């Protein structure tokens, strides 16, 4: 009987003292491809989608086309080059990690402009 109790106690101690080795999952890095964002720019509510190839389309929520071009991540910045203007590349700060749908952040451009951007469900846009 004593052997059974000691053996049971030893097994319980071993089972309870095993450290949890599961590592905490590292959050995914921020990415642009296949994402859609909403924001208000100069009083216009805008929806912007970036496809898998890094092409973006920016439309007013009412459907009016505003801009399109190429988007690329450069470090912690999202950089956009419009196919419609001669402004050149404009880069904005981004969070370090991916945002879930419904989450927002304030992006700051290289020119010092600030914009509150909200991630929404991916919606491929067409011109």
Question: Which stretches of residues belong to each language-model region?
Answer:
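Positively charged n-region of N-terminal signal peptides that target proteins for export
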Residues: 1-4
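Lipid interaction determinants
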Residues: 8, 17-68, 74-127
């Amino acid at each position: 009987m004593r052997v059974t109790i000691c053996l049971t106690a030893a097994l319980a101690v071993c089972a309870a003292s095993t450290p949890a080795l599961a590592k905490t999952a590292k959050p995914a890095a921020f990415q642009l491809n296949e994402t859609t964002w909403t924001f208000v720019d100069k009083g216009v509510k805008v929806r912007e989608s970036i496809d898998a190839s890094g092409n973006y389309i920016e439309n007013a929520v009412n459907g009016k086309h505003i801009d399109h071009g190429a988007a690329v991540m450069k470090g912690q910045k999202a950089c956009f080059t419009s196919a419609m203007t001669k402004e050149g590349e404009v880069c904005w700060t981004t969070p370090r990690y991916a945002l879930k749908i419904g989450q927002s952040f304030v992006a700051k451009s290289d020119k010092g402009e600030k914009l509150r951007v909200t991630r929404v469900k991916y919606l491929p846009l067409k011109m």
